[in-house]
């Protein structure tokens, strides 16, 4: 286990360089996450005869990607970053990929912010193209967990969002402290397990919007559990009742998922 525990010592976050531009493993995993999510969405759109063309789906994913990046970055600035006021007075710096003249990419993304950006982009796209909003949301619910796996692996390879101190033999050393590889826990629980459960639910789907409602509930539960192993966000720590910001937001997501499930099941059955 010694090699595994010291993997960060022996691993370079930069995969390769092109003309002096460093390409990080995180960036590669991010692209893989998008491609996998798109491929899974196309597969189920055809398999389930959803009436969504490949061209329409490609266009939709462009909208979603823009919404996700904007939402994730702005969400991080508003929720987690210690320099929120500075960014609000220097908004052009929010997406600045350079630091001291060196290209470092866009650092600091919030999943919950990404969700908001995704929802806004999806609503705008469906409104503009006269598409069924809930049908698209269900398609995303079944495809996103697959891409999410690669996203969290990217966090692990980028040596960020690491876990709390531990004594378990599979822990990894971060700055001399043995910690939970919580990014991999999240990839497994929030990605793989959520996907498997949604596949089972999908077999008995009764109405459009059911999958996105259950995804919201399942992700919130998985994230809440994983937060017990993840180091609280720097500068924020535990927010209330011994819970991290991620757990507080997950509770809100869980309640939203319950409301959405009740609303769609009892009020919007014919969507």
From Swiss-Prot:
Organism: Campylobacter lari (strain RM2100 / D67 / ATCC BAA-1060)
PROSITE patterns tied to this protein: LGT
Transmembrane segments annotated in the record for this chain: 18-38, 60-80, 103-123, 137-157, 181-201, 209-229, 236-256
Summary of the function given for this chain in its UniProt record: Catalyzes the transfer of the diacylglyceryl group from phosphatidylglycerol to the sulfhydryl group of the N-terminal cysteine of a prolipoprotein, the first step in the formation of mature lipoproteins.
EC assignment: 2.5.1.145
Residues that, per the record, bind a 1,2-diacyl-sn-glycero-3-phospho-(1'-sn-glycerol): 152
Principal localisation: membrane
Membrane topology: Multi-pass membrane protein
Cellular component GO terms held in the UniProt record: plasma membrane
Protein name: Phosphatidylglycerol--prolipoprotein diacylglyceryl transferase
GO-annotated biological processes: lipoprotein biosynthetic process
PANTHER family: PHOSPHATIDYLGLYCEROL--PROLIPOPROTEIN DIACYLGLYCERYL TRANSFERASE, PROLIPOPROTEIN DIACYLGLYCERYL TRANSFERASE
Keywords: Cell inner membrane, Cell membrane, Membrane, Transferase, Transmembrane, Transmembrane helix
Short name of one Pfam family: LGT
GO molecular function: phosphatidylglycerol-prolipoprotein diacylglyceryl transferase activity
Pathway participation: Protein modification; lipoprotein biosynthesis (diacylglyceryl transfer)
HAMAP family: Lgt
Protein's UniProt keywords contain Lipid biosynthesis: no
Localization: Cell inner membrane
Keyword Cell inner membrane in record: yes
Family recorded in the similarity comment: Belongs to the Lgt family.
Gene, per the UniProt record: lgt
């Amino acid at each position: 286990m010694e090699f595994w525990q010291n993997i960060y010592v022996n691993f370079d976050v930069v995969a390769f360089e092109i003309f002096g531009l460093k390409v990080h493993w995180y960036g590669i995993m991010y692209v893989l996450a998008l491609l996998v999510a798109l491929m899974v969405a196309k597969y189920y759109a055809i398999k389930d005869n959803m009436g969504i063309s490949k061209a329409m789906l490609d266009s939709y994913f462009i909208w979603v990607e823009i919404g996700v990046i904007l939402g994730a970055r702005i969400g991080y600035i508003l929720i987690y970053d210690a320099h929120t006021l500075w960014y609000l007075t220097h908004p052009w710096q929010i997406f600045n990929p350079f630091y001291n003249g060196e290209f470092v990419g866009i650092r600091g993304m919030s999943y919950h912010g990404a969700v908001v950006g995704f929802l806004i982009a999806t609503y705008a796209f469906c409104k503009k193209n006269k598409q069924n909003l809930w049908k698209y949301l269900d398609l995303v619910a079944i495809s996103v967990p697959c891409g999410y796996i690669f996203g969290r692996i990217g966090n692990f390879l980028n040596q960020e969002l690491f876990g709390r101190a531990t004594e378990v033999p599979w822990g990894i050393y971060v700055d001399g402290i043995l910690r939970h590889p919580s990014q991999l826990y999240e990839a497994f629980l929030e990605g793989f397990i959520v996907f498997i459960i949604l596949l089972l639910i999908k077999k008995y789907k009764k109405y459009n919007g059911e999958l996105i409602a259950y995804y919201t509930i399942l992700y919130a539960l998985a994230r809440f559990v994983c937060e017990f192993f993840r180091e609280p966000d720097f500068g924020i720590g535990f927010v209330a009742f011994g819970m991290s910001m991620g757990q507080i937001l997950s509770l809100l997501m869980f309640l939203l998922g319950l409301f959405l499930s009740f609303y769609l099941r009892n009020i919007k059955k014919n969507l």
